[in-house]
């Protein structure tokens, strides 16, 4: 990682999923594990068939969640039920059991993005490090502990705390206020151009960068 004008910044806000914690890999591993447990090959041509259906609906639902059109509970219910419905399996109880197992397992996964821990080890003595994430509270802290990175961060700020997702400006202002950070001394680091970069830039004087560790 290279930060221009390093003395300018005191506060580094990190996204968590796929910036530090390897969400895509950890989630896929968890899905495969639970898929096998419930013998879903009897319903789907392959795991990839199931996962493609899930991801399609999950993406749609997160957009609706960000717009306030569905609740967190409805998002979770629909995204696990949809793949089964798509192949004619109207078993909502099965989808709920799958969901419960998924959420029990995924925060125990410890996979990190390449060099994430080394970067945090380097930055922690020099900057105030914070997490700013759209993830759910019951998962994010546990994921960080499982991966051994919780100790690097002074505070975790979640969009769920405010009810507003990144990239809306309100969540960035909320994070700055919650950490008593000055705009001109703060930098947002994340993997999503829209949620992390555009959102931070839209606040005005918050500096930002696009970083994949």
Features from the language model and the residues they span:
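Short, Lys/Arg-enriched N-terminal segments with co-localized hydrophobic residues
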Residues: 1-6
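Conserved Lys-Pro-Asp/Glu-containing loop-to-beta segment of HAD-superfamily phosphomonoesterases
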Residues: 166-197
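Short acidic capping loops at alpha-helix termini that bridge into adjacent secondary structure
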Residues: 46, 92-93, 151-155, 183-186
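Substrate-recognition element of Asp-dependent hydrolases with the DxDx(T/V) motif
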Residues: 97-111, 116-147, 153, 157-159, ...
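N-terminal helical cap/lid subdomain that shapes the substrate entry/recognition surface
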Residues: 8-114
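Conserved small/polar residues in nucleotide/adenosyl-binding loops
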Residues: 209-213
């Amino acid at each position: 990682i290279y930060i221009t004008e390093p003395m300018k910044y005191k506060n580094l806000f990190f996204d968590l999923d796929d910036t530090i914690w390897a969400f895509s890999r950890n989630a896929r591993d968890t899905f495969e594990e639970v898929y096998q447990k419930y013998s879903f090959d009897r319903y789907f041509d392959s795991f990839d068939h199931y996962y493609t259906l899930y991801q399609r609906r999950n993406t749609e639902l997160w957009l609706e969640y960000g717009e306030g059109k569905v609740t967190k509970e409805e998002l979770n219910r629909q995204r696990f039920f949809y793949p089964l419905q798509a192949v004619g399996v109207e078993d909502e109880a099965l989808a709920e059991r799958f969901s419960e197992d998924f959420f029990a397992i995924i925060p125990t996964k410890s996979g990190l993005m390449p060099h994430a821990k080394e970067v945090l080890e380097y930055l922690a003595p020099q900057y105030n490090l914070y997490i700013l994430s759209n993830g759910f509270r019951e998962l994010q802290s546990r994921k960080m502990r499982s991966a051994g990175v919780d100790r690097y961060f002074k505070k975790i700020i979640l969009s769920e705390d405010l009810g507003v997702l990144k990239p809306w400006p309100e969540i960035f202002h909320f994070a700055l206020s919650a950490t008593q950070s000055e705009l001109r001394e703060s930098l947002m680091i994340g993997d999503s151009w829209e949620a992390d970069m555009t959102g931070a830039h839209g606040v005005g004087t918050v500096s930002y960068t696009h970083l994949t560790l």
